[in-house]
């Protein structure tokens, strides 16, 4: 029974180390984002431009169809 606990303990230990390293990197990234407002603008553009483009792609053909009545 002890032999089956060793690998589990090792996996748990390695997992906690990975999580702590990821948290440190995430905290560092958040600090950098707070410092640079231009990056925030870029992130906002990345979020909203695809949304606007997809909405336009859906509605422009419908509007064009209604205007020209060639549906």
UniProtKB/Swiss-Prot annotation:
Cystine connections: 65-71
Signal peptide: 1-22
Main location: secreted
Keyword entries, A-Z: Amphibian defense peptide, Antibiotic, Antimicrobial, Cleavage on pair of basic residues, Cytolysis, Disulfide bond, Fungicide, Hemolysis, Secreted, Signal
InterPro entries linked: Antimicrobial_frog_1, Frog_antimicrobial_propeptide
GO BP terms in the entry: defense response to fungus; defense response to Gram-negative bacterium; defense response to Gram-positive bacterium; killing of cells of another organism
Prodomain residues: 23-45
GO cellular component, one term: extracellular region
Protein location: Secreted
Domain of life: Eukaryota
Tissue and organ distribution: Expressed by the skin glands.
Family: Belongs to the frog skin active peptide (FSAP) family. Brevinin subfamily.
Described function: Has antimicrobial activity against Gram-positive bacteria and fungi but has weak or no activity against a range of Gram-negative bacteria except P.faecalis. Active against the Gram-positive bacteria E.faecium 091299 (MIC=19 uM), E.faecalis 981 (MIC=19 uM), S.aureus ATCC 25923 (MIC=1.2 uM), S.carnosus KHS (MIC=4.8 uM), B.licheniformis X39 (MIC=2.4 uM) and R.rhodochrous X15 (MIC=1.2 uM). Active against the Gram-negative bacterium P.faecalis X29 (MIC=4.8 uM), is virtually inactive against E.coli ATCC 25922 (MIC=150 uM) and inactive against P.aeruginosa and S.typhi.
Protein name: Brevinin-1HN1
Lineage: Eukaryota, Metazoa, Chordata, Craniata, Vertebrata
């Amino acid at each position: 029974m002890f032999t089956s606990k060793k690998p589990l303990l090792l996996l748990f230990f390695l997992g906690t180390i990975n999580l702590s390293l990821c948290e440190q990197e995430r905290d560092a990234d958040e600090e950098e984002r707070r410092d640079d407002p231009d990056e925030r603008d870029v992130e906002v553009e990345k979020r909203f431009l695809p949304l606007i483009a997809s909405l336009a792609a859906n509605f422009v053909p419908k509007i064009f169809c209604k205007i020209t009545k060639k549906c």
